[in-house]
A protein has these predicted regions:
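Interdomain "pre-motor" coupling segment immediately N-terminal to P-loop NTPase/helicase cores
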Residues: 1-15
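Conserved P-loop NTPase motor core of helicases/translocases
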Residues: 16-22, 65, 73-180, 189, ...
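Dynamic helix-loop-helix/coil hinge segments at AAA+ ATPase domain boundaries and subdomain interfaces
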Residues: 20-29, 311
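N-terminal pre-P-loop "Q-motif" helix
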Residues: 25-44, 59
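Phosphate/oxyanion-binding active-site loops and adjacent basic polyanion-contact surfaces
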Residues: 29-33, 52, 56, 60, ...
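Walker A/P-loop
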Residues: 43-63, 369
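Conserved beta-strand position immediately N-terminal to the Walker
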Residues: 46-50, 74-75, 239
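Conserved helicase motor core of SF1/SF2 NTP-dependent helicases
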Residues: 70-72, 80-82, 166-167, 172-444
Length: 444
């Protein structure tokens, strides 16, 4: 059956496409994803939660095509250009999979032209009203006005608009959305969240907030914005995406307590390990490193046993030395996809100073939303006399969740056990690792 896309744009009205909603729920093998799509179709305010790797962007991309006939335009918003491009790539894939030849202007990637890319086949043009206004080469002001008017019409006729929350700040003045899907909603600032809510044209429009309520709040420490997301989650009974498609079961077990043990690892990643990517065995002579690098141990705690004392200002050079040895071991095996992270900026600078250039080094907060094959975490604190708040109050549940969920195949925590067990969340994680034979004391 042939079904038209309804739109004010005559160029689109007169075109017909077979199976305009080809993304029926049976094509999604994941039950939670089908449940979310069903709920988005039937409700106007829907919160969706889930840790990284559970298919939140998959839900967004399918929802776009499911909503366009009744709720056009669908505006998709995410905090960063990288996140927006990731969703665009999934939309592009779905369009190709269904053999849809989307017309010019059907999908718009809205924002600053210098930040955008033509790498996706479904993206025919890039456009920003601000860029038009900033052009000074126009022969007359009337010509400039005509271009701006044409640009506004172009946006009005779009069916799917993708943008960052920053670029979306003036989009509401140009077009009213039938549906707004907010990706990583817990990271969107308060003022921008309000603008996005007001961009929906009426009470019958849809607002879909998607994120992880166990992750960190916005970098600006806009805790009010985060509380809005949490309030939505608490009041509208979110659907949790439970199936993990990114990291193995042992890594999942570290964060599962924070999700009330509701998460499961998909069979495709359940048993993945560094053995899958190692080019050769470790042939070094460091017995500490040899134990830590064993493929069967997918989560490891390296206990410095109080011998690597924390210096002033949240710096621990002993842990830096241990991490250097571990990295050297991995690189000798041909494994270079490694994240090195820490809760503290001072330790971040120390790691950057002493470890080789080109490594991915940063604080836990900076790595939120990123991933790699192996993650090494420097916990720094090593002071048995410190009370809980002084020693580890900064390492809360969201920060722990982010740290533990950066890697696909192996997570290594380096720290002083006697200090870290004062934090009940870290203590639980250390116990989990110990039960899986991943606890090692670094012998000097």
């Amino acid at each position: 059956m042939m079904t038209p896309f309804t739109s004010k744009n005559n160029n689109i009205d007169n075109k017909y496409y077979e199976n305009t909603n080809p993304y029926d729920f049976t094509q999604l093998e994941n039950f939670e994803q089908r449940t979310v799509l069903d709920r988005i179709r039937s409700e106007n305010r829907v919160p969706v939660t889930g840790p990284p790797g559970t298919g939140k962007s998959t839900v967004i991309s399918h929802s776009c095509f499911d909503l366009i006939n009744e709720y056009s335009p669908v505006i998709v918003v995410s905090p960063t250009n990288a996140m927006v491009n990731s969703i665009l790539a999934k939309i592009d894939f779905l369009a190709k999979q269904a053999n849809l030849q989307l017309p010019r202007g059907f999908i718009i990637r809205y924002g600053n032209l210098s930040e955008l890319s033509y790498s996706h086949s479904c993206l025919k043009e890039k456009y920003s009203i601000d860029d038009l206004v900033q052009q000074r080469c126009c022969s007359s002001s009337a010509y400039l006005v005509d271009k701006i008017t044409a640009g506004r019409d172009y946006i009005h006729n779009a069916r799917i608009i993708l943008t960052t929350d920053y670029s979306a700040k003036d989009l509401g003045n140009v077009v009213q959305a039938g549906a707004v899907l907010i990706d990583e909603a817990g990271l969107v600032r308060l003022d921008r969240m309000g603008m996005l809510f007001s961009s929906v044209r009426d009470n019958n429009g849809k607002i879909i907030v998607i994120g992880d309520d166990k992750q960190l709040p916005p970098p600006s420490h806009d805790y009010v914005a985060n509380s809005i997301f949490l309030s939505i989650v608490r009041n509208f009974k979110p659907t949790l995406l439970r199936t993990e498609y990114r990291y193995n079961k042992d890594i999942l077990d570290l964060i599962n307590p924070y999700y009330n043990y509701q998460l499961v690892a998909d069979f495709s990643v359940k048993e993945i390990s560094t053995a899958d990517i190692a080019k050769r065995d470790y042939r070094g002579t460091n017995n500490n490193v040899r134990k830590i690098l064993k493929h069967e141990n997918k989560t490891v705690f390296v206990d410095t046993d109080g011998t690597s004392r924390e210096q002033r200002h949240f710096i621990n050079t002993g842990e830096v030395s241990i991490i250097k040895d571990i990295i050297d071991g991995y690189q000798s095996m041909g494994i270079n996809n490694i994240i090195v992270t820490t809760p503290y900026k001072q330790q971040e600078r120390m790691l950057q100073l002493y470890l080789q250039k080109g490594l991915r080094i940063g604080t836990i907060d900076k790595f939120q939303g990123q991933e790699d094959e192996v993650t090494i975490i420097s916990m720094v604190r090593s002071n048995s006399k410190s009370d809980y708040q002084e020693a580890l109050g900064f390492v809360n549940i969201p920060r722990s969740c982010v740290a533990f969920s950066r890697s696909k195949r192996k997570t290594i925590i380096v720290g002083d056990r006697d200090t870290l067990i004062k934090n009940k969340f870290l203590s639980k994680s250390i116990d989990t690792i110990t039960r899986k034979d991943g606890f090692f004391i670094w012998r000097y």
